[in-house]
């Protein structure tokens, strides 16, 4: 796995766990920050499954 994939996985796990914990413990979450975090998580998920990464992985093999 390339470093960019690890970065994407780290961002997804970190933001997901932080906001998941806040939501499950009924802490106040700013709507703006939640939207920004959701966009970042979705962007990282797209980065994990993008076609460019598949091509790079095939070239590496």
UniProtKB/Swiss-Prot annotation:
TM spans (from-to): 7-24, 29-48
Cellular localization per UniProt: Cell membrane
Please state the protein's primary subcellular location. membrane
Which UniProt keywords are given for this protein, alphabetically ordered?
A: Cell membrane, Membrane, Transmembrane, Transmembrane helix
Q: Name one GO cellular component term.
A: plasma membrane
Q: How does it sit in the membrane?
A: Multi-pass membrane protein
Q: What is this protein called?
A: Uncharacterized membrane protein YdzN
Q: Which organism is it from?
A: Bacillus subtilis (strain 168)
Encoding gene (name):
ydzN
């Amino acid at each position: 796995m390339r470093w960019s994939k690890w970065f994407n996985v780290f961002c997804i796990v970190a933001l997901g766990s932080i906001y998941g914990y806040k939501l499950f413990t009924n802490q106040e979450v700013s709507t703006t920050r939640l939207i920004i975090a959701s966009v970042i998580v979705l962007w990282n998920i797209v980065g994990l499954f993008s076609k460019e990464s598949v091509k790079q992985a095939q070239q590496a093999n």
